[in-house]
């Protein structure tokens, strides 16, 4: 796309500011927009390492002023609450481990925002994600693998990608910060966001407890079936977790115990040794295929099961209710609710074939 009208989603960070600058420099008619996603007073804090704060809104506006582009703030709080925050709580209550950033991309940035942008006459949405989107419509990993965000974009549809721009995919984060400095953007040295933006203090367990209440239950040894501890809410745990178990009876062999599973129906957390976490087969639902048509035959590819997780070779096959991945080497800590993203290795940058939500 050349010389089109685009909406730049500006979070208040360095990546989105430079992405907007590059879009304008490429000849596009750029308008900046900051999304007001929460009305929780705790999110209005200074020096935050999350996002979506009042400070972020001001940083985004200042960046737009430097770039001399129009700037607006869109109130998306109600939609964000329903599609991201409430979904986050419901998933934990169901014993799954959601990825709220992925859900925000799927339901807010590239759905609600994109839909409104198109309705207002914009041709595309520009974001600061570190990923590459070529003229062929294929989504690839960023050249900066340490910052690559193709995993959290793997849930998008081909239609959504066709109206998206990711100008930073060919740059490293160091290059982006240096460019921000050259352009006089005050956010050049602003720290990256790491927290869940709507959990202001970083205490996910406390946030869930306030929403779901206290529901005491048993912590059970997966080998013996014996009760080895108590918990105040199974929702506070995730598969692979080691810290915070507070077991009354340590393992006879003295080795650490990890969360193997969460069973909401019985409010039980099952624990066991690290090797019991190893998984060689993954079932997933709600597949989205963006690297080509839905495969009729099993595909040899690579898969990633967490935002910053290991990448392993696998054979992926379509099933009646989703897909099945046979991992060529076992992975530990595979949690239902996370995404499995399939890649086709390519010298020009690994290509995202598709994604699905891990069921078991």
Curated annotation (Swiss-Prot):
InterPro entries: MnmA-like, MnmA-like_C, MnmA-like_central, MnmA-like_central_sf, Rossmann-like_a/b/a_fold. The record marks 129, 338 as: Interaction with tRNA. This is tRNA-specific 2-thiouridylase MnmA. Catalyzes the 2-thiolation of uridine at the wobble position (U34) of tRNA, leading to the formation of s(2)U34. It holds the Pfam family tRNA_Me_trans_C. It is an enzyme of class 2 (transferase). Its main location: cytoplasm. Keywords: ATP-binding, Cytoplasm, Disulfide bond, Nucleotide-binding, RNA-binding, Transferase, tRNA processing, tRNA-binding. It catalyses: S-sulfanyl-L-cysteinyl-[protein] + uridine(34) in tRNA + AH2 + ATP = 2-thiouridine(34) in tRNA + L-cysteinyl-[protein] + A + AMP + diphosphate + H(+). Gene3D superfamilies: Adenine nucleotide alpha hydrolases-like domains, HUPs, Translation factors. It is found in: Cytoplasm. One of its GO terms (molecular function) is tRNA-uridine 2-sulfurtransferase activity. One of its GO terms (cellular component) is cytoplasm. Residues 147-149 are annotated as: Interaction with tRNA. It comes from Salinispora tropica (strain ATCC BAA-916 / DSM 44818 / JCM 13857 / NBRC 105044 / CNB-440). The keyword Chaperone does not apply.
């Amino acid at each position: 796309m050349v010389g089109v009208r685009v909406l730049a989603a500006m979070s208040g960070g360095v990546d989105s500011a430079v992405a907007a600058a590059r879009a304008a420099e490429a000849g596009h008619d750029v308008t900046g927009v900051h999304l007001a996603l929460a009305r929780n007073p705790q999110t209005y804090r200074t020096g935050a390492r999350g996002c979506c704060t009042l400070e972020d809104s001001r940083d985004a506006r200042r960046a737009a002023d430097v770039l001399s582009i129009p700037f607006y703030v869109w109130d998306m709080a109600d939609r964000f609450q329903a599609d991201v925050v409430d979904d986050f709580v419901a998933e934990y209550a169901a014993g799954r481990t959601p990825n709220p950033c992925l859900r925000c991309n799927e339901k807010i940035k590239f759905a609600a925002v994109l839909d409104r942008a198109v309705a207002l006459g914009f041709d595309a949405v520009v974001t600061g994600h570190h990923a590459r989107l070529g003229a062929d419509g294929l989504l690839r990993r960023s050249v900066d693998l340490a910052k690559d965000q193709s995993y959290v974009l793997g849930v998008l549809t081909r239609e959504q990608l066709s109206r998206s721009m990711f100008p930073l995919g060919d740059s490293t984060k160091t290059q982006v910060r240096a460019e921000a400095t050259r352009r006089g953007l005050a956010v050049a040295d602003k720290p990256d966001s790491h927290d869940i933006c709507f959990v202001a203090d970083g205490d996910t367990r406390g946030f869930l407890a306030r929403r779901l209440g206290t529901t005491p239950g048993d912590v059970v040894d997966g080998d013996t079936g014996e009760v080895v501890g108590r918990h105040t809410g199974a929702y506070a745990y995730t598969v692979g977790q080691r810290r915070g178990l507070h077991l009354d009876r340590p393992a006879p062999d003295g080795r650490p115990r990890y969360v193997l599973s969460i069973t909401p129906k019985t409010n039980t957390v099952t624990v066991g040794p690290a090797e019991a976490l190893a998984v060689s087969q993954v079932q997933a639902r709600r597949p989205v295929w963006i690297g080509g048509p839905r495969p009729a035959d099993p595909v040899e590819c690579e898969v990633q099961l967490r935002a910053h997780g290991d990448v392993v070779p696998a054979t992926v096959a379509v099933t009646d209710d989703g897909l099945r991945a046979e991992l060529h080497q076992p992975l530990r800590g595979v949690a239902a609710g996370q995404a499995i993203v399939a890649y086709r290795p390519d010298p020009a940058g690994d290509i995202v074939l598709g994604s699905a939500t891990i069921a078991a």
